[in-house]
Amino acid sequence: MTTPSTKLNSGYDMPLVGFGLWKVNNETCADQIYHAIKAGYRLFDGACDYGNEVEAGKGVARAIQEGIVKREDLFIVSKLWNSFHDGDRVEPICRKQLADWGLDYFDLFIVHFPIALKYVDPAVRYPPGWLSENNKLEFSNASIQETWTAMESLVDKKLARSIGVSNFSAQLLMDLLRYARIRPATLQIEHHPYLTQERLVTYAQKEGIAVTAYSSFGPLSFVELDLKDAHETPKLFDHDVIKGIAQKHGKTPAQVLLRWATQRNIAVIPKSNDPTRLAQNLDVTGWDLETSEIEVISSLNRNLRFNDPLAPSRLDPIPDD
């Protein structure tokens, strides 16, 4: 099973459904990627910060070696971490990440957060996380413009076919578009019925910037991180509105949540290690929700953001070995 694509402003096609690598276990990552490719997934969304790019690359290499896919059939995404925003750090870390994946280019390389942190040498700690080599939260003076200029050079050097941003506000996008020589192809944001960000989505799409949703299942992604809000918020899978719509269409709650996004041309990047769920998550484009159903799902919005980049737990000192 394959899924439709959306045309990026860079001219490339990006699948509307992909496989996200956040929190994918290193021990199982290669096998998960391999089996996802066999199931029909073509977009894989990784990042330096996830710490599993070497293993992900092994899964890709196995699938290519066995003739299941060719490199050009895949759409591989990775992200620039906060510690590498200085202009002279962008290309070296991109090349390292490409080497980890075993690739010559990324289909899409994204600025992970609009937050520039002090450089951490990969030889000292990789992924670097949020703290400096001094075990503190320390910022770099790199501006987004400096970082973006370096990102554009990745396209010039054919290290990335498209470049994009993540966790940007509309205001930051407006600023970026004033000076960008190469416009961001995508905006990746937390997007689920408890955090719809409708005005941001509308603005990005109006500017020709494709939107990708992460954490499509809302609090579920964050319960294991022991976030208070995630524990206290009703699970979307159990919500009467979602369950009722799922029953009506003969789909699972997960499929309804994903279709709520893809029907509005928003890409999604769920993950699963279960073959049945892998197939179900791909089956979110060939059927439609009614307009009234999309509206009632959107009405669940609470402006509730779970991915807080400055949450206290992320800023705890790293314990000594």
Curated annotation (Swiss-Prot):
> Looking at the Swiss-Prot or TrEMBL record, what is one Pfam family this protein matches?
Aldo_ket_red
Asked if the keyword NAD belongs to this entry, the reply reads yes
Report the enzyme's class at the first EC level.
Answer: oxidoreductase
Q: Name one GO molecular function term.
A: D-xylose reductase (NADPH) activity
UniProt binding sites for substrate: H112
Residues noted as binding NAD(+) in the record, renumbered to the chain: 166-167, 215-224, 271-281
GO biological process per UniProt: D-xylose catabolic process
Which EC number applies? 1.1.1.307
* Residues of the site described as Lowers pKa of active site Tyr: K79
* Pathway note: Carbohydrate metabolism; D-xylose degradation
Q: Which InterPro entries match?
A: AKR (IPR020471), AKR2D (IPR044487), Aldo/ket_reductase_CS (IPR018170), NADP_OxRdtase_dom (IPR023210), NADP_OxRdtase_dom_sf (IPR036812)
Tell me the keywords, alphabetical order: Carbohydrate metabolism, NAD, NADP, Oxidoreductase, Xylose metabolism
The reaction(s) this protein catalyses = xylitol + NAD(+) = D-xylose + NADH + H(+); xylitol + NADP(+) = D-xylose + NADPH + H(+)
Residue numbers annotated as active site: Y50 (proton donor)
Q: Which PROSITE patterns does the UniProt record give?
A: ALDOKETO_REDUCTASE_1, ALDOKETO_REDUCTASE_2, ALDOKETO_REDUCTASE_3
- Which CDD domains does the record match to this protein? AKR_AKR2D1 (cd19115)
The record's comment on protein family reads:
Belongs to the aldo/keto reductase family.
**UniProt xrefs under PANTHER family:** ALDO/KETO REDUCTASE
Q: What does this protein do?
A: Catalyzes the initial reaction in the xylose utilization pathway by reducing D-xylose into xylitol. Xylose is a major component of hemicelluloses such as xylan. Most fungi utilize D-xylose via three enzymatic reactions, xylose reductase (XR), xylitol dehydrogenase (XDH), and xylulokinase, to form xylulose 5-phosphate, which enters pentose phosphate pathway.
For this entry, the protein name equals Probable NAD(P)H-dependent D-xylose reductase xyl1
Q: Which organism is it from?
A: Neosartorya fischeri (strain ATCC 1020 / DSM 3700 / CBS 544.65 / FGSC A1164 / JCM 1740 / NRRL 181 / WB 181) (Aspergillus fischerianus)
Gene name, please? xyl1
